Amino acid sequence: MAAAQVISNSGHEDMIHDAGLDYYGRRLATCSSDKTIKVFEIEGEAHRLVETLKGHEGAVWCVAWAHPKFGTILASSSYDGKVLIWREQHQNTTSPAAGSAWTKVFDFSLHTASVNMVSWAPHESGCLLGCASSDGHVSVLEFQDNSWTHQIFHAHGMGVNSISWAPAAAPGSLISANPGPGQQRRFVTGGSDNLLKIWDYNPETKTYNLSQTLEGHSDWVRDVAWSPSILSKSYIASASQDKTVRIWTSDASNPGQWTSQQLEFDSVLWRVSWSPSGNILAVSGGDNKVSLWKENLKGQWEKVKDIEE
């Protein structure tokens, strides 16, 4: 098993809130209450700070890399209510020493409160970024024909904490004799109203519409994560301030029906994250531990590992 790499000298002057590796695992972006984003190059056990991005006026909560087919693009969201899109531009020069430079290519500032999370859609759906804000609204930014467009709509009355996109292919489409209509644009949001909401894109009206509300948590939903698996079932994990994780399951044969299994913990929970294959769930919370969970043959979720700091 690969050993964890620790970057102890991040250069940030305050708490780090998020860190994300790019598609290839060669770049790491971090963000902090010091209002900056730092980009590191990772090579084996070594790391090197290559850029510090400044543009936010408050703590930066979240960073997210776009798929490389759209270029080297990084999104960030902040307490200042802004979403910034950054792009690495290679210098137009014959000198190999000239390298590249990061520039801010889009500044989205229509939210009226903190933007808590940003999430890129699967690349098959296009260059789409979902944004969750404490103002109760969700926005979806789209890059097309060299320009950015946006939609913004109300989602949760007490604020939106998290957002996660469904896989572009519907569950069961790989193994179905009669596959569905191809690409889907769906995402789930988690709110301070204790609810999860699933949103579907209507290509005729070009709007995102509420298709399902999932109830079960008794406190704020801090994070949601839609599993990337496209086998026979859809899985959504949600982490809550009520010290539980719920794993919601929907079968391809009955896509509107969701059932949930509850995992109980001793502390408030902050984040849930699926493995790339979508079969292992990582959970982290206020006890500084990460636990890994997997579904057994009986359909029950079991803890397979604890990772302590």
From Swiss-Prot:
It is a peripheral membrane protein. It comes from the Eukaryota. Pfam families: WD40. Keywords: Cytoplasmic vesicle, Endoplasmic reticulum, ER-Golgi transport, Membrane, mRNA transport, Nuclear pore complex, Nucleus, Protein transport, Repeat, Translocation, Transport, WD repeat. InterPro entries: G-protein_beta_WD-40_rep, Sec13/Seh1_fam, WD40/YVTN_repeat-like_dom_sf, WD40_repeat_dom_sf, WD40_rpt. The keyword Endoplasmic reticulum applies. One of its GO terms (cellular component) is COPII vesicle coat. SUPFAM superfamilies: WD40 repeat-like (SSF50978). The keyword Metal-binding does not apply. One of its GO terms (biological process) is protein import into nucleus. GO terms for molecular function: structural molecule activity. Belongs to the WD repeat SEC13 family. Component of the coat protein complex II (COPII) which promotes the formation of transport vesicles from the endoplasmic reticulum (ER). The coat has two main functions, the physical deformation of the endoplasmic reticulum membrane into vesicles and the selection of cargo molecules. It also functions as a component of the nuclear pore complex (NPC). NPC components, collectively referred to as nucleoporins (NUPs), can play the role of both NPC structural components and of docking or interaction partners for transiently associated nuclear transport factors. The COPII coat is composed of at least 5 proteins: the sec23/24 complex, the sec13/31 complex, and the protein sar1. Component of the nuclear pore complex (NPC). NPC constitutes the exclusive means of nucleocytoplasmic transport. NPCs allow the passive diffusion of ions and small molecules and the active, nuclear transport receptor-mediated bidirectional transport of macromolecules such as proteins, RNAs, ribonucleoparticles (RNPs), and ribosomal subunits across the nuclear envelope. Due to its 8-fold rotational symmetry, all subunits are present with 8 copies or multiples thereof. This is Protein transport protein sec13. It comes from Aspergillus terreus (strain NIH 2624 / FGSC A1156). The lineage of its organism: Eukaryota, Fungi, Dikarya, Ascomycota, Pezizomycotina.
